[in-house]
From Swiss-Prot:
It comes from the Bacteria. Belongs to the transcriptional regulatory Fis family. The keyword Protein biosynthesis does not apply. Keywords: Activator, DNA-binding, Transcription, Transcription regulation. Gene3D superfamilies: Homeodomain-like. This is DNA-binding protein Fis. It comes from Buchnera aphidicola subsp. Schizaphis graminum (strain Sg).
Length: 99
């Protein structure tokens, strides 16, 4: 599925603005702010080498949890929803102790 045809309209989080009003922010904006915060507070002498895996695991575990709940544990359906192979799904579930 191409990026243009994917519906990301529901990937939003309700947050509060400076006037304490509820506003919807796309998930990607919150991820970007989290990464900016990470680098802002990073000790300048630290060498970051696994940031991609760190970010991926922060997103992947709750994604798997929600999809497995949604499919009531049906791995075939879950893999289909995610667009991955069932064996790949099983590896990911095992990695996070969700098997």
């Amino acid at each position: 599925m191409s990026e243009e045809s994917m519906d990301t309209g529901f990937l939003v989080i309700n947050t509060k603005d400076k006037q304490d009003k509820t506003v919807k922010k796309p998930l990607r904006i919150l991820i970007k702010k989290s990464l900016e915060n990470y680098f802002l507070h990073l000790d300048k002498s630290q060498c970051v080498s696994n940031l991609y895996q760190l970010v991926l695991s922060e997103l992947e575990q709750p994604l798997l949890d929600i999809i497995m709940q949604h499919t009531r544990g049906n791995q075939t359906r879950a893999a289909s929803i995610m667009g991955i192979n069932r064996s790949t799904l099983r590896k990911k579930l095992k990695r996070y102790g969700m098997n």
